[in-house]
Design a protein with these regions (language model features):
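Structural signal for terminal/edge beta-strands and the immediately following C-terminal loop/tail
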Residues: 280, 284-298
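Alpha-helical scaffold segments that mediate packing/assembly in large oligomeric complexes
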Residues: 74-77, 84-165, 297-298
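Short, Φ-rich (hydrophobic/aromatic) sequence segments
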Residues: 18-32, 100-108, 112, 116, ...
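Assembly/oligomerization interface modules of large self-assembling protein complexes
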Residues: 2-83, 283-286
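Short helix/loop capping segments that flank catalytic or ligand/cofactor-binding pockets
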Residues: 56-59, 97-98, 178-181, 188, ...
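Extended oligomerization regions of viral-like shell subunits
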Residues: 42, 133, 141-262, 267-269, ...
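Short loop/turn segments at secondary-structure transitions that flank enzyme active sites
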Residues: 54-57, 84, 93, 114, ...
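Structured loops at beta-to-helix junctions and adjacent beta-edge loops in soluble globular domains
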Residues: 49-52, 90, 172-174, 212, ...
Length: 298
C-alpha cells in the first residue's frame, strides 16, 4: 500500500540514540517546562501534600480553654504520561537521502513540546487523571478595542490583581501584539523591552514576558486565549528517563488495528519517539488572558 515517506519525500539516516540532544530541544521549545518548577519523577509517580489552610490561633483569657484549629490538606499525584509518535519511512529513503536526522532533531522536539504544552496550558488532549491543566483558570480580558488605548492595560492589571504573586507572563504572538498596541494610563508602553532576563522578550508590570505560540488557543470572537500568566512556582513538571527513540522493521498498525505497512516485507521501517512527562498545578494561581482572534489577511 502507499506510504507517506519514501525517497521522493526528503531526509537522512537516523542514528538510534539522539535522546540527549532532542530532550534539550524539547525543553527549549516548551514554555511550560521553561517556567514551571521541575522535580524528579519516578515511573511510579510522586504524591505531593499541599497545605490548604493553616491553623487559626486566637487570643485567650487567663484560665480560658485554648481553641482547637487544625490545618487542612490536599494531595496531588505527579505521574508520568506517555507522549508518542510513530513515523514510517522506506529503506531506500533511509539509505539514499540525507536530512532525516537533522529534520528529526529540529522538528520532533517542537512537536513533542507542543503536545505537552497544549495539554498543560489548555487541556487539549490531556490525560483524564493525574495530570492537571490550566484550562479552568480565571480569565482577564486584554481585548484591544482601540489601538493606543488603555484597554489591554486594564486587563493586565486585573490579572495581577487576581494573582498578586504572578511572576511571569507567557504570551502568544497575538498577545504580544495586544500589549504593544496599547498604552498604560501615563501613555507609556505596556511591554517594556528593556528588561530581558532568561530568554524573556521584556516585562509587563515588572514581570518577565516569554513568547510562545503554545500559549495561544483559538476561541469565539473576543474569547481566544492570547496568553497565560501566574505564579509558576505553583506548577510542577517532571520527566521519567529521557526521550526513547527506536527504529523497527516490524508491521505498523493504526489506532483501529488496520495495517499501515508490513515493515520488513514492504522494505519499510518505523521510527518511534516517546517521552514520559507529568504536570500538576494550582490553577487558582493562574490567569488566562483573553482577546480577539487575529484578523485574517485577504
Amino acid at each position: 500500500m502507499a506510504v507517506d515517506v519514501y525517497r521522493g519525500t526528503s531526509g537522512i539516516q537516523l542514528p538510534v540514540e539522539v535522546s540527549a540532544e532532542i530532550w534539550q530541544k524539547i525543553q527549549d521549545a516548551s514554555v511550560v517546562m521553561g517556567l514551571a518548577r521541575r522535580v524528579p519523577l519516578s515511573g511510579a509517580g510522586v504524591t505531593y501534600q499541599e497545605i490548604l489552610e493553616d491553623p487559626t490561633p486566637q487570643f485567650v483569657g487567663e484560665t480560658d480553654r485554648k481553641p482547637v484549629s487544625n490545618p487542612t490538606f490536599a494531595k496531588k499525584t505527579l505521574k508520568g504520561h506517555k507522549i508518542a509518535v510513530v513515523s514510517t519511512y522506506s529503506d531506500e529513503f533511509r539509505r539514499d537521502l540525507p536530512g532525516l536526522f537533522n529534520a528529526l532533531v529540529s522538528r520532533l522536539p517542537g512537536a513533542l513540546a507542543r503536545t505537552f504544552d497544549m495539554a498543560a496550558l489548555h487541556g487539549v488532549g490531556a490525560p483524564a487523571a493525574d495530570f492537571d491543566d490550566l484550562s479552568g483558570a480565571t480569565t482577564a480580558s486584554i481585548l484591544n478595542t482601540t489601538a493606543g488605548s488603555v484597554d489591554a492595560y486594564a486587563g493586565f492589571l486585573a490579572a495581577l490583581g487576581a494573582v498578586p504573586t504572578l511572576n511571569a507572563w507567557a504570551l502568544s504572538a497575538q498577545g504580544e501584539v495586544a500589549a504593544l498596541s496599547n498604552r498604560d494610563v501615563n501613555g507609556g508602553a505596556i511591554l517594556n523591552p528593556n528588561v530581558l532576563t532568561n530568554g524573556s522578550i521584556g516585562s509587563i508590570l515588572g514581570r518577565p514576558v516569554f513568547r510562545s505560540g503554545n500559549a495561544y488557543l483559538a476561541g469565539d470572537a473576543a474569547a481566544a486565549t492570547l496568553g497565560i500568566a501566574g505564579d509558576w512556582s505553583k506548577a510542577v513538571w517532571g520527566q521519567v528517563e529521557g526521550v526513547s527513540i527506536d527504529i523497527s522493521d516490524n508491521p505498523v498498525y493504526d489506532a483501529d488495528g488496520d495495517l499501515i505497512t508490513a515493515g520488513w516485507q514492504d522494505n519499510m521501517i518505523a521510527v518511534r519517539a516517546e517521552i514520559h512527562v507529568g504536570f500538576i498545578a494550582d490553577d487558582s494561581q493562574f490567569v488566562r488572558l483573553l482577546g480577539a482572534e487575529p484578523a485574517q489577511v485577504a
